[in-house]
Amino acid sequence: MTKRRTAILQCVAHFAAFGASAASADLENENLLVTAPPGYKVGFSDKKPNMVMTEFVPAKETVENWTEMVTVQVFFGLKATPQQFMDDMAKNWRAACPEVAEAHTVADAPENGYPTRVWLLDCPKNPQSSKPEITWFKAVQGNDSFYLVQKAFRFEPSKEQITQWMSYLRKVSVCDSRIAERACPKTAN
């Protein structure tokens, strides 16, 4: 990944976190299009050579004490399929929470030309928090990177909450300025 592309991703994440327009220049190359949920703040972010991650929590919560969380991850250069990633994630969840059932696939179809999958994992009682943890995942296999957005609850969400967050995940997408059929939207100047 070039330094310029890393800077663009950081700008998109930074401006999305504060609800502003994505950037003053058009997006270049492959990008994850995701916004910070209204009423959420950045609780944690980390950048490593092969991955960037941002965790959003409700404005009055922290990543140490949360009831809801949205996690956005970009794995640079990862060539896994959404199915492979889901299988690995489910295996890791079962190791941490023996009560986890199999991953439940919600959607498995290309979006904007990219292999995409949405699934659910449910831990009835997380051994670390002693609370339930229910998480929906949306994974997109890009050409340059692998993208994952998670919505987690530490309680049983209502049907209205599930509908709201499925709508949020539907809006998450990947674009690429180098491929006409997958072009990125023009940003505000």
Model segments located where?
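Secretory pathway targeting signatures of secreted, lumenal, and periplasmic proteins
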Residues: P38-K79
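Bacterial N-terminal signal peptides
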Residues: Q10-A17
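Surface-exposed amphipathic alpha-helical segments
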Residues: N143-N189
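Short, cysteine-centered beta-strand-loop-beta hairpins and adjacent loop/turn segments enriched
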Residues: V63-N65, P124-K131, E156-P157
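Short N-terminal segments immediately surrounding and downstream of signal-peptide cleavage
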Residues: A23-G39
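Signature of long, low-cysteine stretches enriched in small and polar/charged residues
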Residues: N92-K138
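N-terminal secretory signal peptides that target proteins for export/translocation
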Residues: M1-R4
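Mid-chain, structured segments of secreted extracytoplasmic proteins
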Residues: E68-A109
